[in-house]
Each structure stands twice: as structure tokens, then as C-alpha cells.
Amino acid sequence: MSEHHTTAIFSLKGISFGYGQKDSMRPVLHDVDFSLHPGQRIGLYGPNGSGKTTLFRCITGLARPQSGQVLFHGLPLNSENDFYALRCKVGFVLQHAEDQLFFPTVLEDVAFGPLNLGLAADEARERAIETLRDLGLAGFENRLTHRLSGGEKKLVSLAAVMAMQPEALLLDEPTNGLDNDARQRIIDILSSLDTARITISHDWDFLAQTSTQYLTIAHNHLHCCAPSFAHAHMHAHPLGNEPHEH
């Protein structure tokens, strides 16, 4: 990892995690050290089952490692109350938006986080409306959540997290299953945000457009990757003007 002169938002120190009982445990993460600093935009990729989502769950206290420590602004987190403080400031956008949206209308879903932070109902409503407007979702307030498209649900789940004004974002496959238009909207929104973030994706082109540093998980360890750049190749072949696939 590169040197930083700012205090880390959160850090992992020697995190090891596995599934199962001690005598038959399947290791997923081993001795992971990592820190996220303000302004960092990190893309995280790796094969299915490599531990990417588990890493997010360890950061947020939804999974407790067998060893190691999570720190928030330099302070170790031990209790559920400690992790609650982190979750108020580190927004976790789940892979499946339906797991994050619970209320009949979009406005209720987006206002829920600010209400949980202690804002008065009117303040939470205003913040939700402002967040929806900032993300290009003005007019969605009274839409029924269950009738939204997959892409719209992803955007609303992001709005629900952004309404809490987080210091950092954890995004788990934010473009999974989206069409090109919805995917581009996510790219445009993320490109406009200064919020520190880690984004899990199998879509390398998406990561190249929205991240400036890259990590992968292999053999239970977190590894830095060399920067890559989005680019296109020209090509030609006979009958290239006919409909075809690559």
C-alpha cells in the first residue's frame, strides 16, 4: 500500500476469517492488513468465493474474524456499539438492492437512515429529497419501491446510503445485472463523488472508470495490483458490417 499522511477512516490489522468449525474450517481471509484513507477510490476484484464480500462484512462487524482487529479512526472496535458507530459513517451498498429496501415508497427508504442517525422527521425528509435530487432521482419520492426496475432499485439503495452522509462507501457489485443505461448512470454518479470507497466488481471496465487503485484477493490474502487504464482497440474483419458477436 502507498504511504498516506491522513488518518485512516478504518483499518484492518491481521484479520483472519474462515467458515465452519475450528477442526474443519475453510479459511477465507488470512492475516489481512489494510487501511482506507479519505479520497481513495479502490477497485476490488477476484473470483467468486475469494472473500470479497466477507471482507466487507468483517469491516462492518457483520462477520467477526477469528483473529485480528478492526479500527475506526484509529480506535479498536470490540463491541456491537463500536461497530454501530462505524456503520453510521461507512455506508455498505449490498449486492442485491432488495436486501436494503424495506419500505413501500422511495422517500421512506431514503429517509430511514437519517432518522436512525437521530434527525427529526422533517429534517430526514428534506435530506432524503435533497439526496434523491443530487443523484438524478428527483420525482422518485412517491414511487413504490417494489415496482422499480433493477437499475432504479440500485440507485435508490445508493441514495439510501448517501443520505446518511458517509465518510466512506463499500459497494458490492453495484452494476451486477444492470443494462448499459443503468450501468452508465452508476458510473456517472460514482465519478462525481469524492467519498472514499471500495468497490467490488467483476466488471473490469467499470472499475477502470471509477477507481484509481486496485486490489485483489487471492489465496486468502489481499494484494495490490498495478494500475490499468480503460482503452479500446480498433479491429476489422470480412463481413464486419453484418451483425456479429465477439
Regions found by a protein language model. Give the residues of each.
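The feature captures the beta-strand-to-loop junction immediately N-terminal to the Walker
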Residues: 45-47
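Helix-to-loop junction immediately C-terminal to a conserved catalytic motif
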Residues: 60
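Conserved ABC transporter NBD signature motif
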Residues: 68-78, 86
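Conserved ABC ATPase "signature" region
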Residues: 122-140
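Conserved ABC ATPase signature
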Residues: 144-148, 152
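Catalytic Walker B motif of ABC-type/P-loop ATPase nucleotide-binding domains
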Residues: 169-172
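H-loop/switch region of ABC-family ATPase nucleotide-binding domains
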Residues: 201-202
